Structure formats: structure tokens, C-alpha cells
Amino acid sequence: MSIITDPIADMLTRIKNATKRKHKSVNIPFSNKKLKIVEIIKKEGYISGYEIVGQGIEKKILITLKYKGNTSAIFDLKRISKPGLRVYTTASNIPSVLSGYGIAIISTSKGILTDKEARKENVGGEVIAYIW
């Protein structure tokens, strides 16, 4: 068993690999931050659903992936802010992903928000990832 230094990057990689292999679902080790990110991905329509399974140290998030025909709803995911190089943005400089076709996930003082929600709330923060 290896030590995961960036759990968010690990989660995004697991989702990306599962979509490339056309899996129906993927298991992610549980954390509250990951759960909030998964809730945003679900709300934006990139996954079919999720559920929390197990208890204690075995607690996981089971993500049900979404496909249209043979194509995944998620084209790609990219980790932006990393443990060695944090990326922050102000409210006036929030990035737009693929001219609005994708989403940026931003950790703000008001919680984890999409780029659209952060603009509406007029808050900046750490840019966690892009999804399109």
C-alpha cells in the first residue's frame, strides 16, 4: 500500500481511468472535501450518482459514471492546484473552462464552489480542478 500525497489528484485520476475503461462505477476513499467535489460533479451532470458505502476506515464514495451511448459525460479532468504549487484566483480573475463548456472547481471561504457560483458570490480562492 502506498502513501497518497495528493488525495484529490488520486480521486480525479481514478475517475478519469474508469471513464477511459468504460467502467460503470468507481470507488473513491472517503473524505468530506472529496464528497463536496463529487456533489458538484453530480449537480453539473457529469456523473449519474454517488453513494457512501462502508464505515470508519473502510468508508468509500461509490460514484456511478454517466455515459451517452459509448461516450462518457466527462471528457477530461485536470488537477490545477497541487500540494507543491498552489494556484489561487481573485473573484475578478476566475477562469472560464472551454468558454463555459466545462467547470472549474474552486475552494473558497464560502466552501467548494463551481466557477459560476464563485463569480455569483464574488469570491476567489484555490482553483482545485477543471472538468469538461
UniProtKB/Swiss-Prot annotation:
Range of residues in the leader sequence: none
Database matches in SUPFAM superfamilies: Ribosomal protein S8
Swiss-Prot/TrEMBL keywords: Ribonucleoprotein, Ribosomal protein, RNA-binding, rRNA-binding
Record-level GO BP terms: translation
InterPro entries linked to this entry: Ribosomal_uS8, Ribosomal_uS8_CS, Ribosomal_uS8_sf
GO terms, molecular function: rRNA binding; structural constituent of ribosome
PROSITE patterns in alphabetical order: RIBOSOMAL_S8 (PS00053)
Cellular component aspect of the GO annotation: ribonucleoprotein complex; ribosome
Domain of life: Bacteria
Function: One of the primary rRNA binding proteins, it binds directly to 16S rRNA central domain where it helps coordinate assembly of the platform of the 30S subunit.
Subunit structure: Part of the 30S ribosomal subunit. Contacts proteins S5 and S12.
Record-stated family: Belongs to the universal ribosomal protein uS8 family.
Name of protein: Small ribosomal subunit protein uS8
Species of the source: Mycoplasmopsis pulmonis (strain UAB CTIP) (Mycoplasma pulmonis)
